[in-house]
Amino acid sequence: MVSDMLGGNKRWILFGLLSFLLNCVLVSCSVEDIEKAANDSFLWGPYRPNLYVGIRPKIPDSLMTGLMWSNVDDYARFSKMRHSAEHGDDIGAFGWKHYDVRRGGQQVIDDFLMGIKLETDFVKLPEGNWALRVHGIPLPGAPTDLTTSLFFYAYVEGEGKVGTKVNHANHVYMEGKTPDLGKFRIQTFNRLGEHPVSPASVDLESMVMDKDFFAGFNVKKEGAWRTSELILYLLDTKMKVISDKEGYESLKDLPPAYSTLTLPNLPSEEGLQFIQKVFKGEFMFDIVFNYASSKKISEEMISQAIDKNLQEFEEKFQATFPLKAPYDTEKAHQIFAHTAFSNLFGNVGFFTGDSIVSKNPIELDDEDYEFMQGFESAAGKLAEGTAFHDIERSLFTIVPSRPHFPRGFYWDEGFHLLPVGLWDNDFSLEILKSWFSLVNEDGWVGREQILGEEARSKVPDEFQTQYPDIANPPTLILALKGYIERLQEQQGKLNNRFSGEGEDYSLDDLEYLRSVSISNPEKSVQFLRDLFPLLLRHYEWFRETQKGDFETWERECFSQVEGYRWRGRTYQHCLASGLDDYPRAQPPSTAELHVDLLSWMTSFTRSLHFVAEFLGETEEAEKLAGYENAMLRNLEDNHWDEEVQAYCDSSVDEYDDPINVCHKGYVTLLPMMLGLLPADSGRLTSLLKLIRDENELWSPYGIRSLSMNDVYFGTGENYWRGPIWINMNYLILSSLYQNYINTPGPNQNLARSIYEELRTNVVNNVFENWRQTGIFWEQYDPTTGKGQRTKDFTGWTSLVVNIMSENY
């Protein structure tokens, strides 16, 4: 026996080993329980951010719900029914006042055209249930007795069904079942509000419209997302039938819109289901989702959850983002910060579908390759067989703008996860895992995730195709770096709660569930170990597909390998860089080396090196350290221009001799933004002076994307040719704060003065624009500071919260 071979004194070793193994089994069970509790806490959410109100689970092909509404005092406005968030809607500021993905929150929509202010409170309740409270208040200036029609709908995308039923009290509700959710019921409860009176007709007496209207329709599941189009078609058809029957010649002859534009009360066992409510003046009702096996939800429970959500949010915000002077005294600054962060967190979406992928790289490996003037039609490429519909995939992500960009963007996401990771570490890791699950066998991830027909409906045809050699700045590494920094900060501070000797924990404690991957060393190591192969594959894809050409054009530099070029340039754009129309070499050339891409690759390498060391991957760590050193050397050899005193792109002239292509701006500053320069560097001194020069990049509102002295400043599309972007200003401030203002040396004082003044300029400008308009903008004018382009852009513009709290 093994025990005999060990000897008497060593039997205790065997006993200890068995005890350890038993403990591991118990720990494993605990980890599974914790992961289930964590996943359950963010299973449901407003994960259809392209809609004003859309609740679904984080499950592919499952239950989809949404809310639509319109004023029905007349027929004209009904055609502009609210459903999907549209850039051109006559809606003022809309979005979340407070929101937490594990609890819920409150959204406010000022609908000027419909004359109504909608407050929607989404709350998560015990046993996985949820409720949506809808409160409508006539806006100032609108009739206090205006009539509003609202449609709540539900359908199942995959296996399962949902139907409408009527109980003995003549109350309509929905009931359904799916493999993932089991049996469930959705009910609505009117809490406040009067109802219009339908006019008398030949057949019916006038009556108060206090009952819900309802109907179910069998539609193809792949087209069920066109919900508002279906309702508009059906009720428009009903209106025409009535007109023909009664001989009405104009809309003026018709009965009031609120009495005509109603559903026919047809129950259905499956398909797309609607419950319609019609109110006069102010109203409130609850929509309640209940699992069949759980207790019923009361009005009081919903009200208490709403109040608790607000209280918990305010306390959590103060603990995570305590605002620093001069933003720590005024209530307005606090509301502003709450709104900015909530609308980032409320932009989370879960998407499933296929994408259109080109069969060939955009740049063929061909000596006769010519750079394109623009991009090709997706429909055309599909028709000619040069593109295909890739397999269906799912993505959990944060979208930059609900009305304009309701889909996943690779380079935006790294910025999105910086504040989210501070609030809820483990939730940010869920999104990281979701993105890296998209890494294909070659290591590629599409820069835009346009998954399915609903997502494609928001994207121009020429931008729908994804090319397997087009990259994007690898900003997800910023989020991973943030996680690593939190790990370092917590090492040695927290006991391992799984050892049986640590603190007690409860699976109902959301604060605990937010940070399991920090407090539990086993889980943190496992997360990084699972991610590391995907990171490496993705990294090697960058190295291979974006490598510069050192064979055709030799350079005098440390390494004949470490130089990179964004693929997919056109004459006017370099979409892969994320900086679209930022000036590059003209004409485009395969000889180019892009300084911003080398900077991103150096940062990518540095973070991967840390992960390799953390995991004990010594050989990989040594290789990465060698890459990083070569990259830093080549950054100086190939990209520093002594005359211009800036980092520049590199290309060749008509004689094939190397030249620098210098356009001072964000590209120039990126080595400093990513903390690649030593604190005592003379190069840093030059960049700091460039930043502070009012004739170049400095403005009272933030750092401009391109120098005012550049020939391309403010020209053409003028997207990245001067306008101020908050994500890039964040990188400047973050790097100054973390790397330079507290390090003694020749640059410390200048770095500190720039940091203090720039922080105030950026925050004050974003705040002032929000105070005047209630809107967070995509970018800000470089000469006036006025917000412009996409409104309701609460993606990386929300980094203003990190800046206010100096939480980098």
Curated annotation (Swiss-Prot):
One of its GO terms (biological process) is protein N-linked glycosylation. Disulfide bonds: none annotated. The chain crosses the membrane at residues 12-31. Its main location: endoplasmic reticulum. It is a single-pass type II membrane protein. It comes from the Eukaryota. Cleaves the distal alpha 1,2-linked glucose residue from the Glc(3)Man(9)GlcNAc(2) oligosaccharide precursor highly specifically. It comes from Schizosaccharomyces pombe (strain 972 / ATCC 24843). It is found in: Endoplasmic reticulum membrane. It catalyses: N(4)-(alpha-D-Glc-(1->2)-alpha-D-Glc-(1->3)-alpha-D-Glc-(1->3)-alpha-D-Man-(1->2)-alpha-D-Man-(1->2)-alpha-D-Man-(1->3)-[alpha-D-Man-(1->2)-alpha-D-Man-(1->3)-[alpha-D-Man-(1->2)-alpha-D-Man-(1->6)]-alpha-D-Man-(1->6)]-beta-D-Man-(1->4)-beta-D-GlcNAc-(1->4)-beta-D-GlcNAc)-L-asparaginyl-[protein] + H2O = N(4)-(alpha-D-Glc-(1->3)-alpha-D-Glc-(1->3)-alpha-D-Man-(1->2)-alpha-D-Man-(1->2)-alpha-D-Man-(1->3)-[alpha-D-Man-(1->2)-alpha-D-Man-(1->3)-[alpha-D-Man-(1->2)-alpha-D-Man-(1->6)]-alpha-D-Man-(1->6)]-beta-D-Man-(1->4)-beta-D-GlcNAc-(1->4)-beta-D-GlcNAc)-L-asparaginyl-[protein] + beta-D-glucose. Its EC number is 3.2.1.106. Residues 1-11 are cytoplasmic. This is Probable mannosyl-oligosaccharide glucosidase. The active site is at D580, E778. The keyword Hydrolase applies. Glycans are attached at N39. Keywords: Endoplasmic reticulum, Glycoprotein, Glycosidase, Hydrolase, Membrane, Signal-anchor, Transmembrane, Transmembrane helix.
